[in-house]
Amino acid sequence: NFVPPYSSGAMEKLEKAGAVVLGKANMDEFAMGGSTETSYFGITKNPWNMEYVPGGSSGGSAAAVAANMAPYALGSDTGGSIRQPCAFCNLTGIKPTYGSVSRYGLMAYASSLDQIGPIGKNVQDCAEILTLISGTDKRDSTSVMERPFDFSDSYREDLKGMKIGIPINYFGSGINHEVREKILAGAGVLRGLGAELQEFEMPGIEYAVPAYYIVACAEASSNLSRYDGIKYGFRSKNVKDLRETYYKSRSEGFGSEAKRRIMLGSFVLSSGYFDAYYKKALQVRTMIKENFNKAFEKYDMILSPVSPTAAYKIGEQISDPLAMYMADIYTVSVNLAGIPAVALPCGISDENNMPVGMQLIGNNFSEPALVKAAYAFQQVTNFHKRGGIL
């Protein structure tokens, strides 16, 4: 029942435009997770099938929209936390260019990766919300857009002349065969709309997940150090002195996944391991950005999976953190590079009758082009119109 003392920059803009705030949605603790199973408040269930996870970390936002509790929602995307829930819940979501939407009021997980974006039933709804929340904010030093996005030229069905790259190594042995087939079928739809598709090799994907978790956890260990029970956050009641206040407040106030990432971040930032891990991760991050830059010299955008599988059952991965981390393999590189991506539905799995999503990745501030491609796709398909059991 906590009521925030102030609104975020994104919410201020929505309320100014007349939006009605229905409530706060469940999510993984401090955005650390991909299923909402790490949430302090309990697990959110996927409206398509209550035995399955809705994705995360913004799983509550996605579930609310999928269950028709709200026409749209906001989420935060640090390594895929908007796009993966959209893929699992048959929704559309936009992870905007870093700096295009104010992070003022967003509880920081990894400050150089976090970005707020919309979740909705279709890309036009998401684009309208992104128009409202994008633009400059002096309270966020990373805010770089002087004007909001303009999508007025994006609502066309003709993609003639648009060049889309397909990184063929993204579709190797690690991806579920049905997910691969649905996404490649979606590529065929884009080709039918006039887009030129070409396969290519995107180097460096094997380094994306370890580099991401080193950078993200390092920043998290710093950002979450403020939760000490004195200056900020939960305070344990049964304490004898200041030291015990710090110790018990942090021990009792953080869940196991948050503790794991804080410890990992503290480890890679320590003097003995800084060069061996953190410095190398930053070098990999630069390499990933350069690889995207080279790809965008040839292609207007890249078509990629969101997740190697469709949604999985509750409890299947929570005991195996490494498996959960590796599920982010297709999304984290976008955050490391700071570029935008749109996730949208492209089919239903025959194995478990759960949704399958794909993503379109673009260069900095290419959201209008991404929306154009996604809009054209959704005009000739009905995947986004299908609903689950609710």
Regions inferred by a protein language model and the residue ranges of each:
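Serine-dependent amide/ester hydrolase catalytic core
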Residues: 26, 170-172, 205, 228-336, ...
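Short glycine/threonine-rich loop-to-helix capping motif typified by GTGT followed
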Residues: 177-179, 209-218, 313-319
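Short basic, glycine-rich beta-strand/loop surfaces that mediate nucleic-acid
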Residues: 41, 211-218, 355-365
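General small-molecule cofactor/ligand-binding pocket signal
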Residues: 22, 196-201
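Conserved alpha-helical elements of sugar-nucleotide-dependent glycosyltransferases
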Residues: 6, 175-182, 326, 369
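Gly/Ser-rich catalytic/binding loops embedded in alpha/beta enzyme cores
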Residues: 1-78, 185-188, 193, 289
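Structural helix-boundary/capping segments
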Residues: 12, 16, 67-73, 78-174, ...
